[in-house]
From Swiss-Prot:
Keywords: Ribonucleoprotein, Ribosomal protein, RNA-binding, rRNA-binding, tRNA-binding. The keyword RNA-binding applies. One of its GO terms (cellular component) is small ribosomal subunit. This is Small ribosomal subunit protein uS13. Belongs to the universal ribosomal protein uS13 family. PANTHER family: 30S RIBOSOMAL PROTEIN S13/40S RIBOSOMAL PROTEIN S18, SMALL RIBOSOMAL SUBUNIT PROTEIN US13M. Residues 97-122 are annotated as: Disordered. Located at the top of the head of the 30S subunit, it contacts several helices of the 16S rRNA. In the 70S ribosome it contacts the 23S rRNA (bridge B1a) and protein L5 of the 50S subunit (bridge B1b), connecting the 2 subunits; these bridges are implicated in subunit movement. Contacts the tRNAs in the A and P-sites.
Length: 122
């Protein structure tokens, strides 16, 4: 089993798809990695040679920020916005949508489960 960036890649999948199991690598990035490493996108993970795995691992280590480093950068960017007190930071702090979406209806993913408010009695 190929282990790259601390992640065990699934054996029976094409390497292009298997690389997307690593946080920070999508389909396009996976294709670029394989092109630079000289590995076919149709190769299955279990049929990779150790040399090919080493090439892929080396390219990712040198050129792409993945997993823990990327997660740390994202959280530091959000923390920086909150410390600045800018609008986006305030929205992060309040747990509301950051990019201008409506909140009168919807926005349940950010706001959490609905809390019913008692209506006015007649």
């Amino acid at each position: 089993m190929a282990r790259i960036a601390g992640i065990d890649l699934p054996r029976n999948k094409r390497i292009e798809i298997a690389l997307t199991y690593i946080y920070g690598i999508g389909r396009t990035t996976a294709q670029k990695i394989l092109a630079e490493s000289g590995v076919s996108v149709d190769t299955r993970t279990d049929s990779l040679t150790e040399a090919e795995v080493a090439k892929i691992r080396e390219f990712i280590d040198k050129n792409i920020k993945v997993e823990g480093d990327l997660r740390r950068d994202v959280s530091m960017n959000i923390k920086r916005l909150m410390d600045l007190g800018c609008y986006r930071g305030l929205r992060h702090r309040k747990g509301l949508p950051v990019r201008g979406q409506r909140t009168k209806t919807n926005a349940r993913t950010r706001k959490g489960p609905a809390r019913t408010v008692a209506g006015k009695k007649k």
